[in-house]
Amino acid sequence: MTHVTLPILEDWEGLSLTTILQEKFHLGKKARHEIRMSQNVLLNNKPLDDWNTPLFVGASLSLPVFLHDKIPVYEYDLEIIYEDDFLLVVNKPVDMKTHPNDSYETDTCANAVQYYLEKTGQDANALAVHRLDQTTSGLVLFAKNKLAIAGLSWQMENRAIHRTYLAAVDGTWGLVMQTINKPIGEDRHHGSRRQISPYGQPAVTHVKVLENDKRKKHLSCRMPNRNWSDAPNSRSFKRNWPSNYWRYALWWFPSC
């Protein structure tokens, strides 16, 4: 069984293991029960039986790492931007899906990440924390196990991780900075599309012109209020926002 070893941090001082797993890693009840039943939690290399014991700075906590079923590998060498024991950040190329939606889809970014993990001898999962459109290139966060995906998903949901698009557009964009605050709802003519609608959900996009020349405009678009994919924002504003522009390149990167 694979373990991950963590030092007790200052803001964990005096907290129990139950509290750390629930409030710091945001593990659900089922995942916490799975760890408890394994009887493989170590504190300073000794079994920790009482999960209500206060933990203190300087101690070393070792937790068993549980994995989901692994997906098929796709022999594609992605650009790895960052990696540690819990996560990795990859540069997803254009025209590649983030993750498979059906069992027959095995050529996605997640499958390529699984290939990298197995090629490098890591007993880990390729768990996408978020997704990008197939036609959008940029950085994608992947968690390596259940412990990591729980914490990163919570951060994404609670906006501790932000998304920013860089877009190259053609046409006129007047203001250097502006905020588009238009609700987005379903397009009743196309089930998979979204459009600006008075009955839609709130959607905010902060736009800043980075470069402005005669041929094209480079924009920074930050969308702070969505927790899985910002693609509906960008597509809806492209179709509905009253400005004569056309997006021909898009790059995404996260910031904390």
Residue ranges and their predicted role:
Residues 191-199, 210-212:
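C-terminal amphipathic alpha-helical segment
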Residues 80, 169, 206-209, 244:
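Conserved hydrophobic positions within beta-strands
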Residues 64, 170, 174, 210, ...:
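Solvent-exposed residues in well-ordered beta-strands and their adjoining turns
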Residues 72-76, 196-205:
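Short coil-to-beta-strand transition motifs
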Residues 32, 105-113, 186, 215-256:
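Pseudouridine synthase
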Residues 1-179, 183-188, 214:
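RNA pseudouridine synthases
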Residues 165, 180, 203-205, 219:
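Structural detector for hydrophobic anchor residues on beta-strands
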Residues 81-82, 208-213, 224:
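Well-ordered beta-strand positions
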